Amino acid sequence: MEGLTKFLSTAPVLIMALLTFTAGLLIEFNRFYPDLLFHPLG
């Protein structure tokens, strides 16, 4: 049971770190290549 509570307390921290890293990566990518994220359908 101790492992479960430890996992439940660290999972939100890991998810927030991963989301922050992904958002930062997308922001930097969009800053250098602003037209590559949105591909036109045509």
Swiss-Prot record:
- Superkingdom of the source? Bacteria
| SUPFAM superfamilies the record matches | Subunit IX of photosystem I reaction centre, PsaJ
GO biological process assignments: photosynthesis
User: Is Thylakoid given among the entry's keywords?
Assistant: yes
User: What Pfam families is this protein classified in?
Assistant: PSI_PsaJ
Its record classes its membrane topology as: Single-pass membrane protein
Where are the bilayer-spanning segments? 7-27
Is the keyword Ion transport in the record? no
Q: Which GO terms describe its cellular component?
A: photosystem I; plasma membrane-derived thylakoid membrane
Tell me, in one coarse class, where this protein mainly resides. membrane
What does the UniProt keyword field contain? Answer: Membrane, Photosynthesis, Photosystem I, Thylakoid, Transmembrane, Transmembrane helix
The residues forming a coiled coil are: none
Q: Report the subcellular localization.
A: Cellular thylakoid membrane
| Family stated for the protein in its record | Belongs to the PsaJ family.
What is the documented function of this protein? May help in the organization of the PsaE and PsaF subunits.
Protein's name in the database: Photosystem I reaction center subunit IX
Source organism (scientific name): Rippkaea orientalis (strain PCC 8801 / RF-1) (Cyanothece sp. (strain PCC 8801))
Instruction: Recite the lineage of the species.
Output: Bacteria, Bacillati, Cyanobacteriota, Cyanophyceae, Oscillatoriophycideae
Q: Which gene encodes it?
A: psaJ
